[in-house]
């Protein structure tokens, strides 16, 4: 088996270096994919820096992969995938397939522990491997250069829309207009929802309106927030910093839900009466299942929803990562493989 070229962090916080590794024999259930494009997500930086305490080095990050099938394991031969087919791989590379969560179609919550693509050797490489279930066929008309971020950032904000049965008549608010929030706005606009963006940066207003928001509200203006009481069926939080959440809880209509995908480290303080009085709820989620990923990619292709991206050659990966670290990305960075 030939070696795979990649870019790896050799230590926590280190710059990425060229690294070759032996992938071993192809597992029966695995698919090997040639990488064409791979997005950079803040989770990649967290893993490179070992923020979560379980990174293993050398670490090959990257989990927003667009590529082509180059090999199929013996148990992946008749699963609807073909050599040469365009596919995507997101945050998860493996799940056990036999626990209650997997059998019920909730593989992302695999009781044996769904294996992140990064822990499996990720997409900052010429090739990578994943279980066939997590290799997502792509529609022919999807824009492959910008599609990678849909496989992590996109599914992260699409999942709540499925969970809470959002329709064209829903009124939805989005807190934070960054890599996640801007995709949420585009998806909601494509669905026909009434979309309100909450942003602390007034300079973004015209750009956010052009993405499909119906209204932009200054999240630092208490009076503007107070005026929205009782309006929203769903508010999605995409930021990972602590805010005064009470005005957002009060902005929910009866039966409304506050859903966080932003990993806020401090506890959310929710007065019980705020929830009880209007049948309101608070929830959260991470990414999605293979089925949900397929639904997202089909919807994005049909509706022409594409993340706003900046393209770097993979050979300039350290420059691209620094660009993300500096908060300069508009709004997601994608690497083009050039091995």
Curated annotation (Swiss-Prot):
This enzyme can be applied to the microbial production of fatty alcohols that have numerous applications as fuels, fragrances, emollients, food additives, and detergents. Thus, together with complementing enzymes, the broad substrate specificity of Ahr opens the road for direct and tailored enzyme-catalyzed conversion of lipids into user-ready chemical commodities. The keyword Oxidoreductase applies. Binds 2 Zn(2+) ions per subunit. GO terms for biological process: fatty acid metabolic process. It comes from the Bacteria. Its EC number is 1.1.1.2. Optimum temperature is 37-50 degrees Celsius using butyraldehyde as substrate. Zn(2+) 2 binds at residues 96, 99, 102, 110. Its cofactor is Zn(2+). It catalyses: a primary alcohol + NADP(+) = an aldehyde + NADPH + H(+). SUPFAM superfamilies: GroES-like (SSF50129), NAD(P)-binding Rossmann-fold domains (SSF51735). Signal peptide: none annotated. Keywords: Fatty acid metabolism, Lipid metabolism, Metal-binding, NADP, Oxidoreductase, Zinc. The keyword Aminoacyl-tRNA synthetase does not apply. Pfam families: ADH_N (PF08240), ADH_zinc_N (PF00107). Zn(2+) 1 binds at residues 38, 63, 152. Catalyzes the reduction of a wide range of aldehydes including aliphatic fatty aldehydes (C4-C16), into their corresponding alcohols. Has a strong preference for NADPH over NADH as the electron donor. Cannot use glyceraldehyde or a ketone as substrate. Is a relevant source of NADPH-dependent aldehyde reductase activity in E.coli. The in vivo functions of Ahr has yet to be determined. Belongs to the zinc-containing alcohol dehydrogenase family. This is Aldehyde reductase Ahr. It comes from Escherichia coli (strain K12). The gene is ahr.
């Amino acid at each position: 088996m030939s070696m795979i070229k990649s870019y790896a962090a050799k230590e926590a916080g280190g710059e990425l270096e060229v690294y070759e590794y032996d992938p071993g024999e192809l597992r029966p259930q695995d698919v090997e994919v040639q990488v064409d494009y791979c997005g950079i997500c803040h989770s990649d930086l967290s893993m490179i820096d070992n923020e979560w305490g379980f990174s293993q080095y050398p670490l090959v990050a990257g989990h927003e992969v667009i590529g082509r099938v180059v090999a199929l394991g013996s148990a992946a031969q008749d699963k609807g995938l073909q050599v040469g087919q365009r596919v995507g791989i997101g945050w998860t590379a493996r799940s056990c397939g036999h626990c209650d969560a997997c059998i019920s179609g909730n593989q992302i919550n695999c009781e044996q522990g769904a294996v992140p693509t990064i822990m499996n050797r990720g997409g900052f490489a010429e090739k990578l491997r994943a279980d066939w279930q997590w290799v997502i066929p792509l529609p022919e008309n999807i824009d492959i250069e910008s599609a990678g971020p849909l496989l992590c950032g996109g599914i992260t904000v699409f999942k709540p829309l499925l969970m809470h049965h959002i329709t064209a008549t829903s009124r939805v608010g989005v807190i934070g207009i960054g890599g996640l929030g801007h995709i949420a706005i585009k998806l909601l606009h494509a669905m026909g929802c009434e979309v309100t963006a909450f942003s602390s940066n007034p300079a973004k207003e015209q750009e956010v309106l052009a993405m499909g928001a119906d209204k932009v509200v200054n999240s630092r203006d208490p009076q503007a927030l107070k005026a929205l009481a009782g309006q929203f069926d769903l508010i999605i939080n995409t930021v990972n910093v602590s805010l005064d959440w009470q005005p957002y809880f009060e902005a929910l209509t009866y039966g409304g839900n506050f859903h966080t995908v932003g990993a806020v480290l401090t506890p959310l303080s929710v007065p019980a009466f705020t929830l009880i009085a209007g049948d309101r709820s608070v929830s959260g989620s991470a990414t999605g299942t293979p089925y949900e990923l397929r639904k997202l990619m089909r919807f994005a292709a049909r509706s022409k929803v594409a993340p706003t991206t900046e393209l770097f050659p993979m050979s300039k990966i350290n420059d691209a990562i620094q660009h993300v670290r500096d908060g300069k990305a508009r709004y997601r960075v994608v690497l083009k493989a050039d091995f």
